[in-house]
Amino acid sequence: MEEEKQVKVLTQDGERLLTEAETKRYYNLVNKTKELNEKGYTRRDCLLSVKTANITGNLVMLVPVAILCVIYVIANGFNFMPKAAIAQYGGLAPLYGLLAFLVSIAGLVVHELIHGIFWAMGASRGWKDVQFGFIKKNLTPYCTCLSPIKKPIYIIGALMPMMILGIGVSIVAILMGNPFIMLFGIVHVFGGAGDILIIAMVLKEKVEGRDVLIFDHPYDCGFILFEKK
């Protein structure tokens, strides 16, 4: 067992010193890699920069957001415009809008919880392998899995937050004709931008064997693919 001393690594966004939590995950990956290599798996790191993920991901998500907004307008008209919203909700409309936005931000915690629920289904130790945390630099919560999981479970776990909080809530908003609920849904469609890019990367990776495991990267943006041919 290697001594868990803090290490400096080169990530897609530059060199930096790992945090205590990242250091523990780093050594966990070292040990998991050894175990899987002994079982005949080969390792492949699949990474992208946070900047690329944010820019490309949000551009990609403009398509489903535009489609949802068009459907909303067809079904409910432009009741989200300031004058229409005030006519319908009175002077409380701005407050409702602010509240919807704040609840959307708070929903990021639920977003990560949904990741954890589905990934725990495929983790070797269930919930014990699911770790939650908070990135102070970006002011964002995160969820990661400490064990490699089957490819389908990884994809489902990555996709579900956007499907439930984004697409699902947006459909409810369209049916109810509620612009504030729609705001929540749209925020969480954009919130799934990085997840969609990761899923695309997983599907793009060519594998020769059927035994494929995906390991959430311990400190960088991306994942590690283990394949047994």
Over which residues does each language-model region extend?
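Active-site-flanking alpha-helical
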Residues: 114, 118-123, 168, 202
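Metalloprotease/metallohydrolase-associated module, dominated by Zn2+-dependent proteases
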Residues: 2-77, 134-229
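Short pre-active-site segment immediately N-terminal to the catalytic Zn-binding motif
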Residues: 90-108
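Membrane-interface segments at the starts/ends of alpha-helical transmembrane spans
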Residues: 47-51, 85-96
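Active-site recognition of the HExxH zinc-binding catalytic motif
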Residues: 107-120, 161
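Membrane-interfacial hairpin junctions
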Residues: 74-90
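Juxtamembrane non-transmembrane "cap" segments at the membrane-aqueous interface
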Residues: 125-135
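Short, conserved, surface-exposed binding loops centered on an aromatic residue
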Residues: 122-124, 147-148
